[in-house]
Amino acid sequence: MSDRGYYEVLGVSKGASDDEIKSAYRKLAIKYHPDKNKGDKEAEEKFKEATEAYEVLRDPQKRQAYDQFGKAGVNAGAGGGYGAGAYTDFSDIFGDFGDIFSEFFGGGGGGGSRGGGRRSGPQRGSDLRYNLEVSLEDAALGKEYKIEIPRLETCVDCTGSGASKGSSPTVCPDCSGTGQVRRTQGFFSVTTTCPRCKGKGKVISNPCKTCKGEGLTEKRRTIHIKIPAGVESGSRLKVSGEGESGPNGGPSGDLYVVTHIKKHPVFERQGNDLIVQKSISLSMACLGGEIEVPSIDGKTIQLKIPEGTESGQIFRLKGHGIPYLGSYGKGDQHVIIKVEIPKKLSKKQKELMEEFARESGEKVGSGGKSKLFFR
């Protein structure tokens, strides 16, 4: 073993973080692993050297002792560093490097001791997501929708066992029903998915023809779901137990319905408020009056227009907006007024407007289309 310092061996600074130390060791372990460098004594020594350094620097107490006293401070309590009989939890280092383990151990499924394929025994089914387009009216008032979803359900022919009628699955002889096997080679001791049963813990000699041994078949089911008043785009509604059936008799997952509110031709939604534009005549803007305004529930609301109303003026109709989801009360409806200017006037209307202008002291009536003059 060389006399190089542990930080130098891993190629990191003395102030390196735990993640930096782990990453540096991972690269060296992959590069110099004996199974990838068979017969290369130098690579084997570098692998041992890197592992010894990592064993010390990964442990806060050992690292502190090393920083204060060097290797002597570590060896005094550890009995002399890393040897062939020492064991390191490589799954902690390589968590997502199942493909590398497959190369070292000749296949058999990815993952370290925390990974692996599907375990034996009952498992919860997968959750499902369904995107539902909802009209603004339904979002405001609430409505029951009927949706159709594809999902995996327990096979009715084999009742989920995966075996044909008259037969049953048997315990996998390779993993004894655990779904995983432990393999040791060189310095590694790794748990991987059992290649024979693919992690199920059982083997099926005569698979069910309907589900081909999976125990699940795809079905289309109609689900009734109540859309509550007040939902908005992105609201997620949970329907418990309406996801996919669980393998090996496990519980079903859940269904999540995500609402998307469609654009409305009249109303604009802002939170729980509604915005609507309403046009009025010039005479009503000047003299005032009363107009009918549509509401989201299909009814009409009488709105009084005061004298001198300007274009762009906003009137609030309190409590005529969208209900608050899961709470009490509603938002408001805001009416934006647009004053329409007549483009054509009758002779009588023109005379009245000219008289109005004279009373106001305005000079009007140049007539005709506008002209541009350039000097």
Curated annotation (Swiss-Prot):
GO terms for molecular function: ATP binding; heat shock protein binding; unfolded protein binding; zinc ion binding. Binds 2 Zn(2+) ions per monomer. Disulfide bonds: none annotated. It comes from the Bacteria. InterPro entries: DnaJ, DnaJ_C, DnaJ_domain, DnaJ_domain_CS, HSP40/DnaJ_pept-bd, HSP_DnaJ_Cys-rich_dom, HSP_DnaJ_Cys-rich_dom_sf, J_dom_sf. GO terms for cellular component: cytoplasm. GO terms for biological process: chaperone cofactor-dependent protein refolding; DNA replication; protein refolding; response to heat. SMART domains: DnaJ. Pfam families: DnaJ, DnaJ_C, DnaJ_CXXCXGXG. Zn(2+) 1 binds at residues 155, 158, 208, 211. A zinc finger (CR-type) spans 142-220. It is found in: Cytoplasm. Its cofactor is Zn(2+). CXXCXGXG motif repeats lie at residues 155-162, 172-179, 194-201, 208-215. The keyword Transcription regulation does not apply. Residues 5-70 form the J domain. The keyword Transmembrane helix does not apply. Keywords: Chaperone, Cytoplasm, DNA replication, Metal-binding, Repeat, Stress response, Zinc, Zinc-finger. Its main location: cytoplasm. The J domain is necessary and sufficient to stimulate DnaK ATPase activity. Zinc center 1 plays an important role in the autonomous, DnaK-independent chaperone activity of DnaJ. Zinc center 2 is essential for interaction with DnaK and for DnaJ activity. Belongs to the DnaJ family. Participates actively in the response to hyperosmotic and heat shock by preventing the aggregation of stress-denatured proteins and by disaggregating proteins, also in an autonomous, DnaK-independent fashion. Unfolded proteins bind initially to DnaJ; upon interaction with the DnaJ-bound protein, DnaK hydrolyzes its bound ATP, resulting in the formation of a stable complex. GrpE releases ADP from DnaK; ATP binding to DnaK triggers the release of the substrate protein, thus completing the reaction cycle. Homodimer. This is Chaperone protein DnaJ. It comes from Leptospira biflexa serovar Patoc (strain Patoc 1 / ATCC 23582 / Paris).
